[in-house]
């Protein structure tokens, strides 16, 4: 099932975008992209299945309940591809020195120099990370130079590496990669600094604009690499999903990270910390789950009353 889903032409539950063949291309991020005219509603979504998926059989299920997980879409998706490509590209340009030897050996040495710059950048800003030293393996170039780069790291570590690379590219000068990382860092800034669950209209438009700048820049780099037959800047379905996230934020003013607390890793981690403080740490207490759910609900209610009104109340 996973293999068939991975190789399917259609990549989106919100529109008719496809990877290849007839249909709106999923890697078009322009304002006039064809897939923007093929939005699905709940009924058209359900008609696309020969056998309804189990999730859709839950009473009250609606398509709008399928929300974008910002951690897996942005931090563990788009950011990691952008960071991996930028590290490989800057190393190839000699940004961190020119070394002799095999390609992997040269990349390893260059990335170690890059890591030696990343560490003091973090210390100067009182940032604590658990990111190990950069190597060819950490950008998916350890086994073959023909693999598309992808940074391997935790979500929080990837965030800080992205912001460091934004500084590096800013000091190098104007280039498409700098525009890409500006857009990514602007989205990160809004997600981690502005309170939720609702954004003001101005901030929501800022997020949508940064998302559009980042995706258009990435698409431009991807087309240039494809024209030169280079294994760089591969476009994935998560880029398309991020495009939809920018539209949703602009339309609803809903904070892009409002579902963050319900991500599975975050949820499990919090539950384990709470359960460890209980009298019976090896027993998963329903009461613990209820208390955590109540705490999350109360925090969302406080944020809602302290921020702007929801769009339907304005």
Give the ranges of each region predicted by the language model.
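Terminal interaction-prone segments of large eukaryotic proteins
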Residues: 142-144, 149, 153, 157, ...
């Amino acid at each position: 099932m996973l293999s068939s889903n991975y190789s399917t032409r259609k990549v989106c539950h919100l529109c008719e975008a496809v990877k290849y063949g007839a249909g709106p291309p999923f890697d078009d991020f322009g304002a006039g992209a064809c897939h923007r005219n093929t939005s699905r509603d709940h009924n058209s979504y359900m008609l696309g299945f020969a056998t309804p998926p189990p999730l859709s059989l839950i009473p009250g299920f609606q398509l709008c309940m399928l929300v974008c997980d910002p951690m897996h879409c942005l931090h563990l998706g788009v950011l990691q591809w952008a960071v991996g490509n930028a590290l490989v590209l800057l190393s190839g340009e000699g940004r961190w020195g020119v070394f002799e030897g095999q390609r992997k050996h040269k990349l390893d040495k260059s990335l170690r120099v890059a890591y030696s710059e990343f560490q003091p950048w973090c210390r100067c800003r009182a940032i604590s990370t658990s990111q190990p030293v950069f190597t060819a393996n950490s950008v998916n170039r350890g086994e073959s130079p023909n693999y598309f780069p992808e940074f391997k790291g935790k979500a929080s570590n990837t965030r800080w590496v992205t912001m460091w690379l934004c500084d590096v590219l800013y000091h190098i000068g104007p280039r498409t990669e700098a525009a890409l990382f500006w857009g990514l860092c602007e989205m990160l800034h809004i997600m981690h600094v502005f309170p939720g669950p609702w954004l003001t209209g101005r901030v929501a438009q800022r997020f949508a604009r940064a998302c559009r700048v980042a995706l258009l820049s990435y698409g431009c780099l991807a087309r240039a690499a494809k024209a030169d037959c280079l294994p760089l800047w591969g476009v994935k379905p998560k880029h398309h999903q991020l495009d939809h996230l920018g539209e949703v934020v602009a339309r609803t003013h809903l904070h892009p990270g409002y579902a963050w607390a319900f991500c599975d890793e975050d949820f499990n981690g919090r539950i384990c910390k709470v359960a460890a403080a209980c009298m019976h740490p090896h027993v998963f207490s329903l009461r613990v789950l209820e208390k955590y759910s109540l705490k999350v609900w109360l925090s969302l209610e406080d944020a809602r009353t302290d921020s702007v009104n929801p769009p339907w109340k304005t």
